[in-house]
Amino acid sequence: MDVLALVLAGGRGSRMGVLTQDRAKPALPFAGTYRLLDFSLSNLRHSGIDDVWVLVQFETQSILDVLAGGRPWDLDRSHGGLRIVPPQQESDEGEAGWHAGNAHALYANRRLIGNAAPELLLVMSADHVYKLDYSVVIAQHRRTGAD
């Protein structure tokens, strides 16, 4: 595996109030047609990144409904493609095993990530709205020899 993208979609979205009462923040509608999560996945797909893990936690079903098995982004594959990663509980710490934040989600999934052995790991949020070709960013990263 060359590049593995981790899309962090597990936050509560509590500041959104009633909008996230029954759905995860990344599943919120945007411009009447899209969901916030669409932007992250579209950027990845248009950048040629097709190993995508979505880390979920709160109101998971709303995320699963948006993901539709990865079909809208041509990520529904037998090898690679979309993988939905539930919270990993390692001990009795925290709130019933929930991740305490982004860094904790990465730490809790370190074994899964290590087993996948990607050359590069791209970590992104599921609720940001922007357009970016990650292949340009990755090429610059490799050119500079950055860690």
Where are these regions (language model features)?
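Glycine-rich FAD pyrophosphate-binding loop
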Residues: 12
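A short, conserved acidic/glycine-rich loop-to-beta-strand motif
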Residues: 144-147
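Conserved N-terminal catalytic core of the sugar/cofactor nucleotidyltransferase
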Residues: 1-7, 15-129, 134-140
